[in-house]
């Protein structure tokens, strides 16, 4: 297999944390996304591990844009063996009424959250099939405590669980595993932010937990783990891993 990993999305916390952990494990890394607010720092730190790191702009919900991005990754590094795609629940307009129009907006928000996973996995699977070995890891971010993304977090998570299981079955014969990493805290249980602890700043700790799990899933020891939803704590008062 090649030692190249693609990390799509992930913002300022999860994506960089995963990229650095993969680099420490001997992977060259390509960062895919539409914005790179902290990319320079991530690139420098990856290079400190003696690995290469490139940033490739792509609209992750657009199949053509992602296909072009993967082509650039192949040119700059090589065909990837690992794909990590990070997504999060989408916000809804404040004061949304309970009617058919509101339902359609909720469906749209859920589709908007799920679309990048489908697009990136479709593009990445084609690359992994060539190697007859691969790891696909889908990461969903915790709901924002200051917004209303908790309202879409449960349907997004349910959709990702179903997709993960289906993709794992489809790709099993090719030596590719597919797993989901999701928050273990109450943000994933479709509860309002009022139920969460005050002053909760969990982005960094969750990112570290995701990076830790990713490191294990890309290892040969995890060859038999596929189609699973692994829950990671997003707060210090929740155990790091919780069995689903």
UniProtKB/Swiss-Prot annotation:
Q: Which residues bind NADP(+)?
A: 9-12, 59-60, 154-158
Q: Which Pfam families match?
A: adh_short
Ordered alphabetically, the record's keywords are: Antibiotic biosynthesis, NADP
What is the top-level taxon of the source organism? Bacteria
Q: Pathway, per Swiss-Prot/TrEMBL?
A: Antibiotic biosynthesis; novobiocin biosynthesis
- Give the InterPro entries listed for this entry: NAD(P)-bd_dom_sf, SDR, SDR_fam
Its GO biological process terms? Answer: novobiocin biosynthetic process
Family named by the database record: Belongs to the short-chain dehydrogenases/reductases (SDR) family.
What do we know about how this protein assembles, alone or with others?
Answer: Heterotetramer; the NovJ(2)K(2) heterotetramer is composed of subunits of 2 NovJ and 2 subunits of NovK.
Physiological role: Non-catalytic subunit of the NovJ(2)K(2) heterotetramer that catalyzes the NADPH-dependent reduction of the tyrosyl moiety of L-beta-OH-Tyr-S-NovH intermediate to yield the tethered beta-ketotyrosyl-S-NovH in the novobiocin biosynthesis pathway. Novobiocin is an aminocoumarin family antibiotic that targets bacterial DNA gyrases.
Name of the protein in its database record? Short-chain dehydrogenase/reductase family member NovK
Organism this protein belongs to? Streptomyces niveus
């Amino acid at each position: 297999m090649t030692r190249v990993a693609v990390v799509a999305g992930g913002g300022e916390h999860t994506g960089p944390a995963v990229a650095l952990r993969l680099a420490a494990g001997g992977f060259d890394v390509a960062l895919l996304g539409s914005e790179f607010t902290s990319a320079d720092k991530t690139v420098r730190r990856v290079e400190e591990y003696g690995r290469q790191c490139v940033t490739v702009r792509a609209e992750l919900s657009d199949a053509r844009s992602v296909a072009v991005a993967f082509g650039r990754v192949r040119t700059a590094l090589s065909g990837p063996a690992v794909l990590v795609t990070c997504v999060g629940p989408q916000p809804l307009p404040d004061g949304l009424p309970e009617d058919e129009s509101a339902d359609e907006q909720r469906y749209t928000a859920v589709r908007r959250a799920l679309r990048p996973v489908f697009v990136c996995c479709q593009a990445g699977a084609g690359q992994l099939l060539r190697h007859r070995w691969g790891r696909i890891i889908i990461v969903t971010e915790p709901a924002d405590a200051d917004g209303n993304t908790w309202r879409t977090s449960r349907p997004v998570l349910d959709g990702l669980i179903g997709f993960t299981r289906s993709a794992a079955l489809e790709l099993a014969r090719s030596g590719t595993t597919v797993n989901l990493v999701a928050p273990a805290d109450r943000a994933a249980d479709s509860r309002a932010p009022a139920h969460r602890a005050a002053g909760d700043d969990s982005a960094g700790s969750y990112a570290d937990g995701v990076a830790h799990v990713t490191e294990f899933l890309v290892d040969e020891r995890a060859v038999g783990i596929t189609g699973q939803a692994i829950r990671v704590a997003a707060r210090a008062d929740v155990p790091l891993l919780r069995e689903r």
